């Protein structure tokens, strides 16, 4: 196998737009993300369930059933 062909794997600080920072591993020097597990609705429990409704629901609304 060839020596020294792989990029250096660093421990980097990942910073989120919400202000949360944590360490991870990457070949980059620093990472910036827009959303993390600290502010994502799935992890915070502030999910909104959107039910678009199907064809049957539209039919019932159209004919007041």
Swiss-Prot record:
Classification via SUPFAM superfamilies: L28p-like
Cofactor(s) it depends on: Zn(2+)
UniProt keyword annotations, A-Z: Metal-binding, Ribonucleoprotein, Ribosomal protein, RNA-binding, rRNA-binding, Zinc
Family, per entry: Belongs to the bacterial ribosomal protein bL31 family. Type A subfamily.
BP GO annotations: translation
Reported function: Binds the 23S rRNA.
Note accompanying the cofactor annotation: Binds 1 zinc ion per subunit.
A matching Pfam family: Ribosomal_L31
Annotated Gene3D superfamilies: Ribosomal protein L31 (4.10.830.30)
Stored PANTHER family: 50S RIBOSOMAL PROTEIN L31, CHLOROPLASTIC (PTHR33280), LARGE RIBOSOMAL SUBUNIT PROTEIN BL31C (PTHR33280:SF1)
Protein name, per record: Large ribosomal subunit protein bL31
Annotated GO MF terms: metal ion binding; rRNA binding; structural constituent of ribosome
Entry binding sites for Zn(2+): 16, 18, 36, 39
């Amino acid at each position: 196998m060839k020596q020294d062909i792989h990029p250096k794997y660093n421990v980097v600080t990942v910073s989120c737009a919400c202000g949360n920072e944590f360490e991870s591993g990457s070949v980059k020097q620093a990472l910036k993300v827009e959303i993390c597990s600290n502010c994502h609705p799935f992890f915070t429990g502030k999910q909104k369930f959107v039910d678009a409704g199907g064809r049957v629901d539209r039919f019932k609304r159209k004919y007041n059933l």
